[in-house]
Amino acid sequence: MSSSLKQLKEQFVSDLTGGTIEEIYAVTSIALSSYLSFRLLKKSLGDLALIYDYILNVLTILASITVYSNSPSYLHYFIVIPSLVIYLVNYHVEKPSSPHRQNDTKEDKSDELLPRKQFITAYRSQMLIITNLAILAVDFPIFPRRFAKVETWGTSMMDLGVGSFVFSMGLANSRQLIKNHTDNYKFSWKSYLKTIKQNFIKSVPILVLGAIRFVSVKQLDYQEHETEYGIHWNFFFTLGFLPIVLGILDPVLNLVPRFIIGIGISIAYEVALNKTGLLKFILSSENRLESLITMNKEGIFSFIGYLCIFIIGQSFGSFVLTGYKTKNNLITISKIRISKKQHKKESSSFFSVATTQGLYLACIFYHLAFSLFISNLSFLQPISRRLANFPYVMWVVSYNATFLLCYDLIEKFIPGNLTSTVLDSINNNGLFIFLVSNLLTGFINMSINTLETSNKMAVIILIGYSLTWTLLALYLDKRKIYIKL
């Protein structure tokens, strides 16, 4: 890549200020409309061809960040209204007393501690889809600049996306935590060192990918945005160091509710930013080349915020992933099942919740925390993905709590086994598909000048790009190949 083109591409994603939170929610909620529409159609028509699955769950999201980026409300109508009409017509044609309808209206009551929940698969998969689409789309003019990552202060769709990616990883990671949980935790150096060793080994593949990405970017003279993570750091390093730090914190995480730890660390970091010289140190451009730390200060210090998001994401697993109420699962992990009789007797029954109830309470709590920040802008700094500060953490968590609740309510509104083959396939190899999309993004950027690509051609390229990793996910899933990184 020529140095002049590299500079132009770097300028194209630099010094941006983002957009409004309301617009971000309007655009990203297209995923909810797509999921609702898919369930309505599958409920009415039975199994859908893969092409319709792909159109509803991938192309509609692509349209929301490109062609319909300025009018997402119209796209919501185009997606939902036809499928709703088909569903209502089918509802009146089909006899209400039919066994099929009676079975579907019964609420799912699982006896499994960790059942596979359709709405969680949809949430994680569609979050990956919009992330994969955005990392390439951002290099084309058709992708609005207000959706791209902001320079320092402000909100954008991609800023929200990177935090949501980490949150969803924390949520998924909590499945293993619940499986391995014992109610009578006792610290021992042997088990502690074993945990650190296991987590380090788990981190190695991701850290190697981070190193490969760094070397590739430098060798190929690929465009990079230094104020995003620094000179050497990249998102794979952030993901790779998470298990190591979690292993170090393991004794505390086993004794103190995770949401308290996540919020506590985030508040302590916010105080350090505002009451010491840390904020000035991170944002200063004059100290960039002084040391390895200053070269990568954004990546190193934003890691604290992402760690908090991950830990809070883990805290959701105890009531989101479980198939039934467990003791105090709103605030801590437990395998002790709470029956209806026990629930009435328990003095702490408020903290023993079903999934929907827990999500309602989480939405209220984190939105209040986020609103408290909004009303105290003079006391706190604005939202900053570059810093991953406390306002950013609360924004990401409150958003994901809300969207998880919406996915859950959609599944309850349209009950039944209405799985999407595309979403299942992407979810089953999520991190690997994310890696492939990064490689494809690099290849496309090295092959063409994205800045001079027409909107029509950009959409064609993005469709081909999305089709490539979707087909790969479908192939791997069909062959039962699951690549865990």
Curated annotation (Swiss-Prot):
Q: Which Pfam families match?
A: GWT1
Enzyme Commission identifier(s)? 2.3.-.-
Membrane-topology annotation of the record: Multi-pass membrane protein
What InterPro entries is this protein classified in?
PIGW/GWT1
List the GO terms this entry assigns under cellular component, sorted alphabetically: endoplasmic reticulum membrane
At the top level, the lineage of the source is Eukaryota
Which biological processes are named by the entry's GO terms? GPI anchor biosynthetic process
Pathway field of the UniProt record reads: Glycolipid biosynthesis; glycosylphosphatidylinositol-anchor biosynthesis
Q: Which UniProt keywords are listed?
A: Acyltransferase, Endoplasmic reticulum, Glycoprotein, GPI-anchor biosynthesis, Membrane, Transferase, Transmembrane, Transmembrane helix
Q: Which residues are glycosylated?
A: N103, N180, N417
Protein name per UniProt: GPI-anchored wall transfer protein 1
Gene encoding this chain? GWT1
